[in-house]
Amino acid sequence: MKKTLSIIMALCMVLSVCFFSVSAAEAKVGAVAADYKPEGTAITDAAGFAAMAADGIYYLANDITLDATWNAGVAVSSTYKENNAFTGTLDGNGKTITTSAPLFANLQGTVKNLTIAGAIDGGGLNCGVVTMWTKGTLTVENVLNKATIVNGNTTGGILGYGATGTVATFKNCQNDADLIAASQIGGIAGYIQDDVVVIENCVNNGNLRTDNYGAGIIGRFGRDAGALPDSVATITGCVNNGTVSSAKGQSAGIIAYLVGGAQIIDCVNNGTIVNDTATSAGILGSTRDPDKKKISGVLIKDCFNYAPVNGVTYVGGICGYLGRDANSHDGWNFRMENCGNFGDVTATGSGTMYVGGVSAYGWGGNVGSNGLANGLLNCFNAGNIKVDNSGDDSVKAYVSGVIGYFNTTVYTLENCFNAGTITTNKTTYATLIGWNNRGEGAEGVTADYCKNNYSVASGDIPVFYNGPVSESVGCTVATADQFASGEVAYLINEAAGATIYYQAIGTDKAPTLIAAEDGSNVVEKKADGSFANPAKEVPEDTKPADPVPTGDSALIFAIVAIISVLGIATVAKRKEN
């Protein structure tokens, strides 16, 4: 019997592995379906790749190896920006290119369904594995990069540098390679000056190191001088899993530096973020608008950070510096909705600091051209915050569980909470929820903007600063037990008149914005005043129709059921194909 049992269990394991391996292969970035039929002219080797016409349509018939960039016969050098562009389509057809050079110097066409491997020395030039540079329309879809880059200037796993006039789209792309650069760096794109960029469902798994701006998805979007007023970056469903470290500038999980409007939605950072001298954040490092173009603003929604964030000046779990440069802020707005930070936030240095569990610094206007007021709605911090400032007594360190500092006349700070501890050696400018420098008494500002917010206590740190006085309007201090019991989640939801926060009582130490599919983490108040999740409904008739198998018969019954399910799934899959 033992031998029979071993054979049956081994068979089940083999079948399970095969089944899940097929599922994983179907979802692999760069791959195509078995019945996929590419269009165009077949490429079978490096010579065929080099001979491609600039506007042709091509596909790979097999894996190939390259040691040179396609450049229409023009040498790749510091003048590559003026090289003939490839405006056609290259379909990888699920195949792999192994290369020691970027595929293109100037791509203004489409690359899709491709895996790229190898190692590239950027030679101090702007460098991207798919293309070094672009100006025009660029589309990259379903591309996986495994090729490392060292010695690059502006560098990206897919695109290095996009000049003014670029309209770039990246969908379902992934970078698995480590990248090292001297300037802007991103797992997908290094720097796009403007006009429009759309990045959807892209992932960075590589570790990135730069001397300047660095982020898991795109290092920088928008230019400081002459920024176009309608430049917009839309980044949705993207994830960074790699460590991002910068010597200066800004570091972030999704985008490091932004000059222009942006919507950053449903993005996640899981990689440690480090900046040696300046700004760090889990999602967005810094926004600016030096030319006062009154760009529409920035919306960060449904984004989460799960990793440590370490920096010096502006350090935030979700965002570092969110706003324009000094003066003339009216009409430009920043807003965060439904965002949460779980990572520890640490600032170390000797100069002025702005540190926040959600956002370090916010500076905007009244109501943006998108009709939304500035502020944070339904945002939280569950990470611990630490500030170590070695400056003298004149140095200010603004630190808070939600937003370190903001300066605006119309602001929403609503349904937010801080469940992390705050440790700082400078407490003068520390608050549990936030510090508003404009505050009550300034034109257009009332206490109504700040409401229904909660925080755990951290020593004698006041809950909130509103203008000339420190006060607790709209903010309540709660104990760790009140957070863990579900009470805070319930109270916020009750006051908001909607179910915003969820919590698995007994498991989650604080509320979350993520609902369980079965509704099991909804928080309810019981008759005795305690809080609990909904009781699981038990069907009235739980008696089985037939006797429950036991012993060896139960084992055999289970094995047969598994094999039957796998067989049905296989047949169904064949019919679909």
Model segments located where?
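A cross-kingdom C-terminal cell-surface attachment/processing module
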Residues: 554-574
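Sec-dependent, cleavable N-terminal signal peptides
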Residues: 1-27, 567, 576-577
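Short, hydrophobic alpha-helical membrane anchors of single-pass surface/secreted proteins
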Residues: 4-7, 549-561
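Predominantly extracellular beta-rich ligand-binding scaffolds that present long acidic/polar faces
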Residues: 25-539
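Short, aromatic-rich amphipathic segments at membrane interfaces
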Residues: 533-552
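Sec-dependent signal peptide cleavage junction
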Residues: 15-31, 546-554, 572
